[in-house]
Design a protein with these regions (language model features):
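N-terminal Rossmann NAD(P)H-binding glycine-rich loop of SDR-like oxidoreductase domains
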Residues: 4-26
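NAD(P)H-binding glycine-rich loop region in Rossmannoid oxidoreductase-like domains
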Residues: 58-100
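Short alpha-helical oligomerization interface
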Residues: 89-104, 142-150
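Short alpha-helix in the Rossmann-fold core of NAD(P)-dependent oxidoreductases
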Residues: 98-105, 109, 122, 157-158, ...
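Conserved Rossmann-fold NAD(P)-dependent oxidoreductase catalytic core, especially the SDR/UDP-sugar
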Residues: 106-153, 173
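Conserved beta-loop-beta element that borders a ligand/cofactor-binding pocket
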Residues: 126, 159-184
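Substrate-positioning beta->alpha
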Residues: 198-221, 229
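Mid/C-terminal beta-alpha module of Rossmann-like enzyme folds, strongest
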Residues: 215-289, 295-303, 308-319, 326-362
């Protein structure tokens, strides 16, 4: 069945704007919701210049009445729910993140459930639901059946949102995303801390934001095969990486060059809480159902590199000077933070943001 009208939350973000563009190019009507900022308005203007029927709607998902009005007015046949306060920014205000990530989802579900024809509800969940993944204890791939065990508040938010969706009675699919990569990622202090906290030998399964967008766009017409499923969204085998290798590939791509193993601390093989919330996905079923893996890792790196423009040439020239300086700074930061021989990411994150950044203790 071809779905004509789709509501997309977070429609002007790194995945949302690309998903919206695909849907518009396919002749669909897209109710594009987001918060009004300079970036979202610019993305709206770019999308409005193309084909398809774009209906931009700036609302806060915490405003239940506004959400209901949009849903009841436009009666979407499918909802793609991408909006969230993601980690690490969520660590700064976990209370607000919980209200948006869980409460906002509940508002959207309540509005959708009031429609005479229930829409298909596709939600962007996260690898964060699986928590710390010690590859020495759990060498196998993550599958849709792998038990959730969040270690941070963001993963806990996603688990709670998933539970609300299951309880809603709406036809749905939960798309748990790997490490989404695009030129839109802003490497501010929070992201740099998360990168430094992550063990260099931590497993990470990356995915191009364009492929994530395609997965959601393809999903809206496939309710019969998707409903009730958990699907793991990550790239093909070229995206199966260790954290240090991924970072160095990106740094080489933008011109700085590789920092090497000494830029990261390793994970502790004996500590199940000493690893980040990423692992390697078994994407077999998701790829069969959604047919979304169109890019290879080298294409994603090239995309990032091209986005740097003339800065790439400058970084390439300065790389031999900058690399040893960066390694020295990283070493001094670790010493100042009192870090030991292992990365121990969640101790560092709790020290920086407080215990609210972590999932509630059992």
């Amino acid at each position: 069945m071809t779905v004509g009208t789709i509501l997309v939350t977070g429609a002007f973000g790194q995945v949302g704007k690309r998903c919206t563009q695909i849907l518009l190019e396919r002749g669909r009507t897209v109710i594009a919701t987001d918060l009004r900022t300079g970036k979202t308005v610019a993305a709206q203007a770019e999308l409005s210049a193309g084909a398809g029927a774009l209906i931009p709607t700036y609302i806060d998902l915490l405003d239940a009445e506004a959400v209901r009005e949009v849903v009841v007015t436009h009666r979407p046949e499918a909802i793609i729910h991408l909006a969230a306060i993601v980690s690490p920014p969520s660590y700064r205000n976990p209370g607000l993140a919980r209200r948006v990530n869980v409460g906002g989802t509940e508002n959207l579900l309540a509005a959708a459930a009031s429609l005479p024809g229930p829409p298909l509800f596709l939600m962007a969940s996260s690898a964060a639901v699986y928590g710390s993944r010690n590859p020495y204890r759990y060498p196998e791939r993550i599958t849709p059946e792998t038990a959730v065990n969040p270690i941070d508040q963001y993963g806990e938010d996603k688990v709670l949102a998933e539970e609300a969706i299951r309880a809603s009675g709406l036809p749905h699919a939960l798309l748990r995303l790997g490490g989404v990569v695009s030129p839109d990622t802003r490497l501010d202090g929070d992201y740099l801390l998360l990168i430094r906290a992550t063990p260099g030998d931590n497993r990470i399964h990356a995915v191009d934001a364009r492929d994530v967008a395609l997965a959601f766009a393809n999903g809206v017409d496939r309710e019969a095969t998707l409903a009730g499923k958990v699907l793991l969204i990550a790239g093909n085998e070229s995206y199966v990486k260790l954290q240090r290798d991924l970072e160095d590939d990106m740094m080489a791509g933008v011109g700085l060059g590789r920092l090497g193993p000494s830029a990261s601390l390793p994970g502790d093989p004996t500590d199940d809480r000493g690893w980040a919330f990423t692992g390697w996905f078994d994407t077999t079923e998701a790829q069969q159902l959604l047919d979304f893996q169109e890019h290879d890792w080298h294409q994603t790196v090239a995309w990032i590199a091209e986005s740097q423009g003339h800065l790439r040439a400058v970084l390439r020239a300065l790389g031999p000077i900058l690399r040893p300086v960066m390694l020295t700074v990283l070493k001094l930061q670790r010493r100042a933070e009192g870090r030991g021989p292992y990365a121990d990411p969640w101790t560092l994150i709790a020290k920086k943001y407080g215990s609210g950044a972590l999932a509630a203790a059992d």
